[in-house]
Amino acid sequence: MNSLNDEPFAVVEQFSEVQIVQLHELVQQQWWGGKRTLEQVRIMAANSSLTIGLADAASGRLIGFCRALTDFIFRATIYDVMVDRAYQGQGLGGKLLDTLCNHPRMQEVGQIYLACEPRLFPFYERWGFKVYEARTEWMVKVQREEL
């Protein structure tokens, strides 16, 4: 774990089994994550291109997380930016985005995408994201109902 400027939080890129369980608990706090199982969360973390966590430096408890799927050159898509409810309002979502977007492996990526609720636009705009108006629209093929 790397300290964040002597703050009580540390960056995590490799997650212990205990932290994977804590990640599952964090996912369960989200409106979209209630049906996701521990095993599914474990698979998701293992197969993401880049995962960033924030942990309480004293206890090691995982309190924030985000991830990206990317080819590390043309495109990246950020998913699952989340901070434990007990730690929200301390700027940790921004620390997650800063750490992910400025990660050495992300420096050659041409465009970084994310999807969010419109109420979150002002938050993400502070990190340079904008509503993407293009000639194309995202399409989805549902192969199973989202958990």
Model-derived features with residue positions:
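A conserved beta-strand-loop-helix scaffold within acyl/acetyltransferase catalytic domains
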Residues: 40-58, 62-82
